[in-house]
From Swiss-Prot:
Keywords on record: Coiled coil, Cytoplasm, Cytoskeleton, Meiosis, Sporulation
GO biological process, one term: ascospore-type prospore-specific spindle pole body remodeling
Assembly information from the UniProt record: Interacts with spo2.
The UniProt record lists the keyword Magnesium: no
GO CC annotation terms, alphabetical: cytoplasm; meiotic spindle pole body
Biased composition (Low complexity): 12-23
Coiled coil: 16-104
Places the protein is found: Cytoplasm, Cytoskeleton, Microtubule organizing center, Spindle pole body
Induction section of the entry: Induced during meiosis by the transcription factor mei4. Protein levels rapidly increase during meiosis and then decline.
Full protein name: Sporulation-specific protein 13
Length: 138
């Protein structure tokens, strides 16, 4: 038969083995959890890296689009200003030409009136001469 001390040692030994098995199981579970966590963290880091890269690409495209829009706006306003300046020049040229033609027309109207007056005077003079000649022949 076994003594109490031997029985205690046996229970102690069994208890130590159970604790050892529990610890091994806990350690194995912890390793699996750590591996799963490491994989999840690695996956999240990769996903974050892709998203950061995509955001940087999109920010670059946005900046490029804004620059193009600014360049187009500057170009559009420059072209519009040039068109307005050209229209003003054309209008000024047309005003000068209109003033010249009006002055020329005024001069021609004056000459026409002078000619009309001369013709009337000539007609009246012919009538007078005609009466005068007729009076002399009768």
């Amino acid at each position: 038969m076994m003594s109490n001390s031997q029985i205690s040692k046996l229970f102690s030994s069994i208890s130590n083995k159970e604790n050892s098995n529990e610890n091994a199981l806990k350690e194995s579970t912890n390793k699996q959890l750590n591996n799963a966590n490491t994989l999840a963290i690695t996956h999240l880091k990769e996903q974050l890296s892709r998203e950061v890269q995509r955001r940087e690409e999109l920010e670059g495209l946005l900046e490029q689009s804004q620059k193009e829009m600014e360049d187009l706006s500057v170009s559009l306003f420059t072209e519009a200003n040039e068109m307005v300046a050209k229209a003003r020049q054309d209008t000024e040229v047309l005003k000068r030409e209109l003033d010249y033609l009006r002055a020329k027309e005024k001069g021609r109207i004056g000459k026409l009136r002078s000619i009309q007056t001369a013709v009337r005077t000539s007609i009246e003079a012919r009538k007078l001469l005609s009466y005068s000649n007729e009076s002399n022949y009768h």
